[in-house]
Amino acid sequence: LWFNLGAFVLPGGLLLLQAQLLRKAVQEANWWVRLGLTLVQLSALAFAMQGVLPLDQRGVDAAASRLHVLMWMLWWIAFVPGALLLALGQRQRRGLAVMSAAVGVLVPLLAVWAPIGVWVGLAQRLAFVLWFGWWLLVSRCLICTSASAPKSSPPAGR
């Protein structure tokens, strides 16, 4: 219970809240950014729900276990198009766009296709680290972008 709360519910819930706060920052952005943010917000909700619906190794066919697996799939399936839409919507910020596209491709590779044998735990943890790191950088970039008026020069020191 405590592991699920600390590993899934708390971080996913905080990212869900962060995405909701970012909505103000992107309300003047193009639709790609707004839709991308909505999809990555859904990804954060699915991540948090993995902790609410624990995976039981003894009863993999149980309803809670099936729902946990469904939330795990929704986590990365919602993230990929969300990150790619944010990359397309932030083309003027080349670094952010390239990073979003790269992470959007790497997360499912690490979460789904790389976990074989010894790599199972490590690959999934790397996918989580990439996902969390992406959230931190994108949040910072979107907040900094919204701090200046439209069509003005970027904030000083950036």
Predicted regions span which residues?
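Interfacial helix-start motif at the membrane-water boundary
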Residues: L1-G13
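Juxtamembrane loop-transmembrane helix junctions in multi-pass integral membrane proteins
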Residues: W2, Q27-R34, G59-R66, R91, ...
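Interfacial segments of alpha-helical transmembrane regions
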Residues: V26-Q41, R94-M99
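Small-polar-interrupted transmembrane alpha-helices in polytopic inner-membrane proteins
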Residues: L37-V52, M99-L110
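Membrane-proximal helix-loop-helix units in multi-pass membrane proteins
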Residues: L45-L88
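Terminal transmembrane helical module of multi-pass membrane proteins
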Residues: L86-P150
